[in-house]
Swiss-Prot record:
Phylogenetic placement of the source organism: Eukaryota, Metazoa, Chordata, Craniata, Vertebrata
Disulfide pairings: none
Protein name in UniProt: Uncharacterized protein C12orf56 homolog
Transmembrane segments: none
Species annotation: Mus musculus (Mouse)
Renumbered residue ranges of the record's region Disordered: 60-103, 121-155
Composition-biased stretches (Basic and acidic residues): 131-142
A Pfam family: DUF4551
Bias (Polar residues) ranges: 60-74, 92-103
InterPro entries cross-referenced by the UniProt entry: DUF4551
UniProt superkingdom: Eukaryota
Length: 530
């Protein structure tokens, strides 16, 4: 299809919201019989747009006919460019970018081509400004059903009777997107952007994260671009000093992470100056899985400081990976020295080595529970668990890169399979997968307290990694089925998930879908053995 036959779709994520520009692909009718179809739907009331969700089911012939009719008549885009939103806002209100919710969809009956619908709207009951995540809509799903390309993201809550009645008064407009290839970059970016939005919207339900986010968007930015660049260069030069202490490095990395949270430009600079990425990975290698300083193998206080610094480094790397899919410099940095990326993978799956516990001894009774030794033993245990959770989050981000096939390793399937093949060749991977399963069990068992937003996101990431292992690695799949059969039988099941995962979290539905897929992958193999 020539470039003159389509208009580009740009879907980007900025500040936790989507900005949707001119959004239609004009596809020749001859191509409609073999390609996925997406339907972006917009509903609008007389007093302005509002959130909604609705299932869409339409045959292929109807969609093709409608496309031909639309192509023969002038098309009127029902959505407005962000610059035109002011005209839609009531008097006295500012402008805003509409925040989308994605409605559920059904596969077309005629073929296996997926059809998806997006509802795009914003509330008009309050001034048009960036919405409080706690007031954001709690419903919406984004689902693609097709061969090897099925995913479900989003969350939905039962609509109230009043909400259902109001839906009857809304006008409906449709905007069709015909996806030529499910592995196209725009399609992968669309999925990735929605996934980023789901995670961010869930995390912002945590009061602490929400307050930090409101502080960032509610205050004028204190620096101009030149000053941000100068700040970044200063941090980088100070980090590269040879006489830095561990505490100094920790402070500088924390400052870098906080600055990157406030200004996206620092993420861009981080990937453009690849030396800093290599520096942080090499710094991790100094302390993990064991410290190069042999004194730290006996000094628990020093080892605790090292683990705290490593956790901060991994959190900073995770922040730099998050929401930077469209940065070409990131791909260039990762592809330039693949060895550094694979060294990072080995570090993430390796359990940190800590000094042996001195609380018990064959020749001595239990140590005084108030002693420093017992305190540091407990501290090291907590830091080890925190390290595993932080490493899981970063491994998830790297897994997304290979899932999208963005490293030039061939097709998407080959890329993720190549990564899983590398991981299963690493001796620490079995123990890491065991820690992942233990983390899921820990999250779904014990008390019946609801998971926090951060715990819910971590659970989603854990299930995503387990599903990837089951789908793309025979060795890891067999290990999970054989060595963790009891965990999936008694602790990891849908009722336990429903009890612990609040329905108001946007990430609840995709996590439930992931859990269901993981259980299905395990049960299918067990049935095959029977």
């Amino acid at each position: 299809m020539g470039s003159e036959s389509l208009e580009t779709l740009q879907v980007i994520l900025s500040g936790g919201e989507f900005m949707l520009h001119t959004s239609v692909w004009l596809v020749p009718g001859s191509l409609l019989s073999s390609h996925p179809v997406f339907t972006f739907k917009v509903k609008q009331e007389n007093n302005g747009p509002t959130f909604w969700r609705r299932k869409v089911s339409r045959t292929l012939n109807e969609s093709s006919l409608r496309s031909q009719q639309e192509s023969s008549t002038p098309f009127k885009d029902p959505t407005s460019h962000p610059s035109d939103l002011k005209e839609l806002s009531p008097a006295g209100q500012g402008t805003s970018r509409p925040l989308p919710t994605l409605s559920s969809c059904q596969s077309m009956a005629a073929t296996d081509m997926p059809v998806c619908s997006l509802s795009l709207a914003s509330s008009t009951n309050e001034p048009q400004e960036l919405p409080d995540p706690r007031d954001a809509p709690r419903e919406g799903s984004f689902r693609l059903d097709g061969n090897q390309s099925e995913f479900g993201l989003g969350n939905s809550l039962p609509a109230s009777p009043l909400h259902s009645c109001r839906n009857l008064e809304k006008e409906e407009s449709e905007l069709h997107l015909y996806i030529i290839s499910a592995t196209s970059s725009i399609f992968l970016h669309l999925k990735s952007s929605w996934n980023n939005y789901i995670i961010r919207a869930t995390l912002l339900q945590d009061p602490l994260c929400a307050s930090e986010h409101n502080d960032v968007i509610g205050k004028p930015k204190p620096y101009r671009s030149e000053e941000k660049i100068k700040h970044f260069c200063q941090l980088k030069s100070e980090l590269f000093l040879k006489d830095n202490t561990l505490r100094k490095i920790l402070c500088l990395i924390t400052e870098l992470r906080v600055a990157a949270q406030r200004n996206f430009i620092l993420k861009r600079l981080f990937w453009k100056t690849s030396e800093l990425f290599y520096f942080l990975v090499n710094k991790l290698h100094e302390y993990l899985p064991e410290s190069r300083d042999k004194h730290a193998l006996q000094n628990k206080s020093q080892r605790a400081d090292e683990l705290m610094a490593c956790i901060e480094i991994i959190q900073t790397l995770g922040l730099m990976f998050r929401e930077t899919e469209i940065e070409s410099s990131r791909l260039n940095t990762l592809a330039a020295k693949k060895g550094t990326l694979f060294n990072l993978l080995v570090i993430l799956i390796s359990k940190p080595k800590v000094p042996k516990s001195c609380s018990k001894s064959d020749a001595q009774p239990v140590a005084d529970p108030t002693s420093a030794e017992v305190f540091f033993d407990s501290q090291l245990q907590k830091l080890t668990l925190e390290y595993t959770d932080t490493a899981t989050a970063l491994l998830y981000e790297i897994l997304l890169i290979f899932q999208q096939g963005n490293l030039g390793l061939g097709s998407t399937k080959f890329a993720i399979s190549w990564m899983m093949s590398f991981l299963q060749s690493c001796p620490p991977i079995m123990a890491f997968v065991a820690r992942i399963v233990e983390g899921v069990v820990r999250g779904l068992s014990a008390s019946f307290q609801l998971l926090t937003p951060c715990q819910a996101v971590l659970l989603y990431q854990q299930f995503y990694i387990l599903r990837s292992c089951l789908q793309h690695s025979k060795a890891l799949a067999e290990y999970i089925r054989n060595d963790h059969r009891e965990e999936f039988r008694y602790f990891i099941h849908m009722p336990a998930l429903e009890q612990r995962l609040p329905g108001c979290y946007p990430i609840t539905e995709p996590t439930t879908q992931l859990c269901h897929e993981v259980l299905q992958l395990i049960e299918q193999k067990q049935c095959a053995k029977c």
